[in-house]
Amino acid sequence: APEVGFVTATGIVAGNLPLALGAALSSKGRGESDVAVAFFGDGAAQTGLFHECLNLASLWQLPVVLVCENNGFAEFSPLSAHTVVERLADHADTYGIPTETIDGNDLTLVRPAAAVAIDRARNGAGPSFLECLTHRMRGHYEGDPTLKRGTAERDEAKDPIQRFARFLDDAT
């Protein structure tokens, strides 16, 4: 629904990144203040397309926020089998993109980090990279054999919605 700012979605790993950069380039070229935001998983951060997009986003100072949902697994494989970096945000650092790694399950941290990144992009300061550390509440897909993953992984205490509800309850 482009009329509400949603351009597209794709099932291709990292395929939404160049689409977000295209939207950001279009906004910048028209002199508009729109900001593109792309959400992707840690598996996408292991693709060549990811690095090409980081390079161009930085080179062209595009108004884009790249949000990596890092749950530590690329489909079935632990992240340690795919990369040597401790933080996936380190990749963006290499391209001169400001980064922040946060607890992606804590909405009180996500919202202000996103606001800073969006303001940067909207004010012409270029891209930002947010690495949101999280966990899987469900399998990678409906038939995922890892649905039997340990209870610590599925702990409802980590659920961001329930966690924020507790935060609101405690604040009243």
Question: Residues of each region from the PLM?
Answer:
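Glycine/aspartate-rich loop-and-adjacent alpha/beta segment that forms the canonical ThDP
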Residues: 120-172
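Short beta-alpha connecting loops at secondary-structure transitions
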Residues: 72-77, 97-102, 144-154
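Glycine-rich, charged/polar anion/phosphate-binding loops
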Residues: 50-53, 112-119
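Conserved thiamine diphosphate
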Residues: 28-32, 84-116, 156-172
